[in-house]
Amino acid sequence: MSKENKTTDFGFTQVPWEEKQKKVAGVFHSVAAKYDLMNDLMSFGIHRIWKKQTIAKSGVRKGDNVLDLAGGTGDLAYKFCQMVGQQGKVILSDINSSMLEVGKEKLTNKGCVGNIEYVQANAECLPFPDNYFDCITISFGLRNVTDKDKALASMCRVLKPGGRLLVLEFSKPIIPLLSKVYDEYSFKALPFLGKIITQDAESYKYLAESICKHPDQQTLKQMMYDAGFDNVEYQNMTGGIVALHIGYKY
């Protein structure tokens, strides 16, 4: 079947392959202005702990080149700017112009200048040279990508030998009771919060559905191996609600 005739998941809905990117863009154009507030409300602030653990595992040092992919409002990029110093460089990249604008304004206001660039790019075809980055992170972005295999291969291409990829993403709870409670919360509370805070319940309904459709921990681990990464491991956080996958390029 050609890509033009293929369908893919947009939450629980099947849509033509080429339409998913447009629909996801609509979601994030809608929520960009309130994205940070909603993250704090939805996760009770725990997303900050998940991101802190990701940064701690990154191995980023002074002078490194770092790509924060699907970096949105720049939580990780801000910390990486401090870690790489003026000898290094951070690229905050997102496919969504609204998210990128919010991130640029936020980081500029926090004094993050001189060693950061902002690049609107599609993860499936990254516009960077081969073997360029010491570290790549993608935080809560992979599940929104249409062709995840192609995106992972693109990340592997632009990563230096010896570099690492960190994928922080919602995953599958490993405790049955937690899974049931989490599903109830996701499908009822998230759209309700979206309606109250952003006047957009549908975008947060998609969020809940996209989490359910995202590959589980073992499947994503194998996808990273298939894309060319080695020594892939993952760490469950908050009972598997979130998982951090780390893979290396040798």
Swiss-Prot record:
BP-aspect Gene Ontology terms: aerobic respiration; menaquinone biosynthetic process; methylation
The EC category is transferase
Sorted alphabetically, the keyword list is: Menaquinone biosynthesis, Methyltransferase, S-adenosyl-L-methionine, Transferase, Ubiquinone biosynthesis
EC number, as in UniProt: 2.1.1.163, 2.1.1.201
Function field: Methyltransferase required for the conversion of demethylmenaquinol (DMKH2) to menaquinol (MKH2) and the conversion of 2-polyprenyl-6-methoxy-1,4-benzoquinol (DDMQH2) to 2-polyprenyl-3-methyl-6-methoxy-1,4-benzoquinol (DMQH2).
GO MF entry, a single one: demethylmenaquinone methyltransferase activity
- Please verify whether the record's keywords include Transferase: yes
CDD domains named among the record's database cross-references: AdoMet_MTases (cd02440)
**Where does the chain bind S-adenosyl-L-methionine?**
T73, D94, N122, A123, S139
User: Which organism does this record belong to?
Assistant: Francisella tularensis subsp. holarctica (strain LVS)
Its lineage reads: Bacteria, Pseudomonadati, Pseudomonadota, Gammaproteobacteria, Thiotrichales
Its name, as the record gives it, is Ubiquinone/menaquinone biosynthesis C-methyltransferase UbiE
PROSITE patterns assigned to the protein according to its UniProt record, in alphabetical order: SAM_MT_UBIE, UBIE_1, UBIE_2
Gene designation per UniProt: ubiE
* Pathway assigned to this chain's UniProt record: Quinol/quinone metabolism; menaquinone biosynthesis; menaquinol from 1,4-dihydroxy-2-naphthoate: step 2/2; Cofactor biosynthesis; ubiquinone biosynthesis
Q: Which Pfam families match?
A: Ubie_methyltran
* UniProt xrefs under Gene3D superfamilies: Vaccinia Virus protein VP39
Entry similarity comment: Belongs to the class I-like SAM-binding methyltransferase superfamily. MenG/UbiE family.
Q: Which InterPro entries match?
A: SAM-dependent_MTases_sf, UbiE/COQ5_MeTrFase, UbiE/COQ5_MeTrFase_CS
Which catalytic reaction applies to this protein? Answer: a 2-demethylmenaquinol + S-adenosyl-L-methionine = a menaquinol + S-adenosyl-L-homocysteine + H(+); a 2-methoxy-6-(all-trans-polyprenyl)benzene-1,4-diol + S-adenosyl-L-methionine = a 5-methoxy-2-methyl-3-(all-trans-polyprenyl)benzene-1,4-diol + S-adenosyl-L-homocysteine + H(+)
